[in-house]
Amino acid sequence: MKPSGLIVSVQAPEGSPMRDPDVIAAMADASLRNGASGVRLESPEHIGAVRQRCPTALIVGLWKRSYPDSSVYITPGWEEIRAVWAAGADVVAIDATERYRPGGENLEGLIARAQRELGAELMADVDSVANGLRAAELGCTWVGTTLFGYTESTSGQKPPAWDLLPLLRQQLPAEVSLICEGGISSAQQ
């Protein structure tokens, strides 16, 4: 599956009155009806609600979960990958940085298991060229600059990751989709 066009992130933080599956599904539906080529959704519950309302939508799914022993929070482990896929995501977004994962799980093992047991297509949320290339080598078919500016090693930098994009595009295999994500705040960008 190749993305084309704008994929709209339809998410609401914990505690927000907008964090309701019906509200998220309505916002996703409105985005798709107004030209979005897909939506990026957080949590199995929201993914399921959008899949039910918009059965043909391209859904990039993730699950943000915090663990005390790790700074990885975007679909950090097998339990989250499995739940996001089961909820109806077409592509599962995972943190593909080299940071320590909860419970000692490792990126290579998670990617291999997701492909073997689920046949899931994976989007690597990365913060650097090295992490993007590594994720593609491990089997991720989408790479996004999602975590640029949000990890310990990139915390001083501000998204969007304009400098990262050409380097990734030059070095990633042509069949790997590259997504600019984060910090885009205007139509001109």
Each predicted region: which residue ranges?
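N-terminal amphipathic alpha-helix/helix-capping segment at the start of soluble metabolic enzymes
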Residues: 1-18
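Conserved beta-strand positions in the central sheet of alpha/beta enzyme cores
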Residues: 7, 38-40, 91-94, 123, ...
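Charged helix-capping and loop-helix junction motifs
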Residues: 21-25, 73-79, 105-111, 129, ...
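Catalytic cores of alpha/beta
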Residues: 24, 69-87, 127-141, 174, ...
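Glycine-enriched alpha-helix->loop->beta-strand junction motifs that scaffold or abut catalytic
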Residues: 35, 54-59, 86-91, 116-119, ...
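Glycine/small-residue-rich loop that forms an oxyanion/phosphate-binding "nest" at active or ligand-binding sites
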Residues: 50-52, 56-105
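Glycine/Thr-rich beta-alpha phosphate-binding loop at enzyme active sites
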Residues: 90-102, 136-166
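Active-site/ligand-binding-proximal alpha/beta "capping" segment
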Residues: 101-117, 158-189
